[in-house]
């Protein structure tokens, strides 16, 4: 996101000074991250955000929880909604957030606390009724939803999926911690940046037979290699699609999602004819004589383990 502008929309009882915004700045030092303090009243918050979008013309908007709910309605811009609270009124009451509440982060207006009333909850319920009002095919391509698979507070994956196609689970809870930002949010940001720039990365195909050990666990250094490859390449997993045993596809898809989570979303290819695939590199335990790119024979003398694969790609420097 070099030279680009990002708006970060914080969650309920937070502020623009949240550590999440600073982490985004640290990971994208050549981008400008704007993180405003939101008014507690939702109509005022949406007015502020819409005006900010008009004046700043951001390249990307990222919102978490309540901020994810607001972010969905900022149409026309690429957006990522993280654990979006599309049922904000119910979330407040069910999470015991009525009465006096203290802001979790320092606000520029100096406010320290607020009284959450039934009238305010009603305002949020009325605001959430406006969600998804302008969803089009074009908008569906602009919006990603990221949902923590252990989120105890917000459960809106199915609701989001009724309107948008790019719904992704990630390993995490409700709060967006640094680990989740690095492993799951940043890859999605790279996808968006690549699309905006028309950037075509080289493609690395990884065969299923290189992934797991005899106990079905990820092989040593597999995650390390995957993280390295994600920085520079489009990475896809290639698995067989046995005609007489289709359940294998479901099982392998579940293993990939559990092992690699969000970055592997829509990056699994099931085929019985891998030689027909196009890519720049193919990491496979078997010979692929008809593949037009470079084949790295996993388990061979040159590439006995994932550590040798890592060394190979480090020397390439992203080519």
Regions found by a protein language model. Give the residues of each.
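Short, hydrophobic beta-strand segments that form beta-sheet elements in well-ordered domains
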Residues: 59-63, 79-81, 143-149, 267-270, ...
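Active-site catalytic motif of lipid deacylating hydrolases and related acyltransferases
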Residues: 2-55
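Asp-based phosphoryl-transfer active-site loop
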Residues: 197-216
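Short, acidic loop-to-helix structural element flanking the phosphoryl-transfer center
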Residues: 213-237
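Charged phosphate-binding loop/patch that engages nucleotide di/tri-phosphates or the phosphate backbone
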Residues: 165-202, 294-319
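Gly/Ala-rich beta-loop-alpha elbow adjacent to hydrolase catalytic centers
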Residues: 62-72
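The alpha/beta-hydrolase serine catalytic core
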Residues: 78-80, 84-192
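C-terminal cap/substrate-recognition subdomain and adjoining C-terminal extension
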Residues: 246-319
């Amino acid at each position: 996101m070099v030279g680009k502008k990002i708006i970060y929309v914080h969650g309920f009882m937070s502020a623009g000074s949240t550590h999440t915004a600073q982490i985004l700045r640290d990971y994208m030092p050549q981008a400008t991250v704007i993180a405003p303090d939101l008014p507690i009243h939702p109509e005022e918050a949406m007015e502020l955000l819409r005006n900010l979008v008009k004046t700043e013309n951001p390249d990307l908007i990222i919102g978490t929880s309540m901020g994810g709910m607001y972010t969905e309605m900022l149409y026309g811009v690429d957006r990522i909604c993280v654990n979006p609270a599309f049922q904000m009124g119910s979330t407040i009451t069910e999470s015991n957030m009525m009465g006096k509440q203290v802001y979790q982060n320092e606000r520029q207006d100096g406010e320290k606390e607020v009284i959450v009333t039934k009238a305010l909850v009603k305002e949020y319920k009325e605001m959430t009724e406006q969600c998804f009002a302008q969803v089009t095919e074009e908008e569906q391509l602009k919006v990603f939803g990221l949902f923590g698979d252990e989120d105890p507070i917000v459960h809106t994956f199915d609701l989001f999926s009724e309107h948008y196609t790019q719904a992704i689970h990630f390993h995490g809870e409700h709060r967006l911690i640094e680990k989740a930002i690095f492993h799951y949010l940043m890859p999605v940001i790279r996808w968006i940046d690549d699309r905006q720039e028309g950037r075509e990365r080289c493609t690395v195909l990884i065969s299923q037979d290189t992934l797991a050990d005899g106990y079905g666990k990820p092989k040593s250094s597999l995650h390390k290699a995957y993280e390295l490859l994600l920085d520079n390449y489009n990475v896809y997993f290639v698995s067989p699609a046995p005609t007489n045993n289709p359940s294998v596809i479901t099982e392998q898809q579940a293993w990939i999602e559990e092992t690699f989570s969000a970055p592997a979303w829509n990056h699994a290819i099931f085929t019985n004819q891998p030689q027909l695939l196009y890519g720049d590199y193919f990491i496979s335990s078997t010979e692929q004589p008809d593949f037009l790119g470079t084949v790295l024979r996993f388990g061979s003398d040159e590439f006995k383990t994932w550590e040798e694969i890592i060394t190979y790609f480090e020397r390439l420097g992203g080519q």
